[in-house]
Amino acid sequence: MPVITMKQLLEAGVHFGHRTRRWNPKMAPYIYGARKGIYIIDLQKTLKLVEEACDFVKSKASEGATMIFVGTKKQAQHVVKEEAGKCGAFYVNNRWLGGLITNFKTIKPRIDKLIELEEMEKNGELAKLPKKEQSRLRKALEKLRKNLGGLKAMDRIPDIIYVIDPRKERIAVAEANKMGIPVIGVVDTNCDPDPVDFVIPANDDAIRSIKLITSKIAEAYLEGREGVSFTEETPSEPIQSDSSEEEEGSLDISDLFEDTDLKEEE
């Protein structure tokens, strides 16, 4: 059974790329064509690459691999937290702290401090302190929660990293590359796909697109960990395309622009 269907991809606006003046030529193999100044992503390739990424995640998760979801852009923050929470993955949705992967030993004490302060808050110790000290520690706690709240259970660097928009998360991607950690990325038409091991060409600005792809990665991770199946029973609806020219039986590219609001560029 397919992990995802063509209908789902279309309805979520996954096919909307950036304007043609804002593109990376390295994304050309993943582009179906262009119309009205906007690139259209080849969903036939997206469909295949989502399947490949999910198969990889499921396989590694079944072996006990850990995973971190990274999405700090506004549209991705809630989705990343929600989906990582569902599958038990770590997440970063506010700011990537430099050295999180390459120098984890300097980050771990901050995670430990977060856990310590939360325990103090829970058992009432924090409330017993002088008001000035309380205020200082509560501010520190709020900051730690914002940046490290999704990493409290992480005691070593992750085995897989999933990023939404590798262009924005370039520091996280660079650290993963340096440490030899496989990178799965939702890659839009303005990104460089080279640093990403598992490219998922997709709209990385629309919430519905981000939600759809991220939920499938999360389901694959959970399925690998617990053996729960989430695959779709509805068969996919393939698009016949291998270039910007329309062929007999292919999707009419003009039909893809009915919901242009699905591209929520920053």
From Swiss-Prot:
InterPro entries recorded: Ribosomal_uS2 (IPR001865), Ribosomal_uS2_bac/mit/plastid (IPR005706), Ribosomal_uS2_CS (IPR018130), Ribosomal_uS2_flav_dom_sf (IPR023591)
Domain of life: Bacteria
Sequence similarity: Belongs to the universal ribosomal protein uS2 family.
Segments of skewed composition (Acidic residues): 243-266
Pfam families linked to this entry: Ribosomal_S2
Record keyword Ribonucleoprotein present: yes
Gene Ontology terms: biological process: translation
GO cellular component terms given for this protein: cytosolic small ribosomal subunit
Record flagged with keyword Ligase: no
Region annotated Disordered, chain positions: 227-266
Biased composition (Polar residues): 231-240
The protein, known as: Small ribosomal subunit protein uS2
Species in which this protein is naturally found: Pseudothermotoga lettingae (strain ATCC BAA-301 / DSM 14385 / NBRC 107922 / TMO) (Thermotoga lettingae)
GO molecular function: structural constituent of ribosome
Keywords, ordered alphabetically: Ribonucleoprotein, Ribosomal protein
SUPFAM superfamilies xrefs: Ribosomal protein S2 (SSF52313)
